[in-house]
């Protein structure tokens, strides 16, 4: 299995795929102290996103979501990588600000929802340039 994402922020990562089945807002939907999904209406409520390759077919939310991403990076509990169905400037901004503050940089890729659906439930490896493969 090999796929090519569109690079929004380049980097390398490895982590278990976590495909969110519904959109979520990081502001109010993700606990920045634990990385767990806290929105009680979300079907994956309670799941931790730390260290995962987080696939988000669609986003919902607030411009404050970038601050939550920044907190996750600062605490070392951010996802290993982000895969957006469509480019998302808000969460990407959190990663960019984190980079400027010296926090670890995670890769951020755009990968169509139809392509995300084809990803196997396994540990994925993201290479520089956006190559996605099973680890």
What does each of the following model-derived ranges do?
Residues 129-135:
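Phosphate/diphosphate-binding glycine-rich loops and adjacent basic-rich segments that engage nucleotide
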Residues 7-9, 19-128:
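Feature captures the catalytic cores and cofactor-binding loops of soluble hydro-lyases/lyases
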Residues 1-17:
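Catalytic or ion-coupling anion/metal-binding cores of large enzyme and transporter domains
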């Amino acid at each position: 299995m090999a796929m090519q994402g569109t690079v929004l922020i380049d980097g390398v990562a490895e982590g278990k795929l976590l495909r969110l089945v519904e959109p979520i807002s990081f502001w109010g939907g993700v606990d920045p102290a634990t990385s767990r999904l806290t929105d009680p209406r979300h079907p994956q409520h309670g799941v931790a996103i730390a260290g995962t390759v987080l696939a988000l077919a669609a986003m919902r939310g607030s411009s404050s979501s970038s601050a939550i991403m920044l907190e996750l990076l600062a605490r070392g509990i951010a996802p290993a990588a982000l895969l957006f169905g469509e480019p998302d400037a808000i969460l990407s901004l959190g990663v960019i600000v984190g980079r400027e503050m010296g926090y670890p940089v995670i890769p951020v890729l755009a990968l169509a929802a139809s392509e995300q659906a084809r990803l196997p439930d396994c540990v994925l490896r993201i290479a520089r340039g956006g190559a996605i493969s099973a680890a």
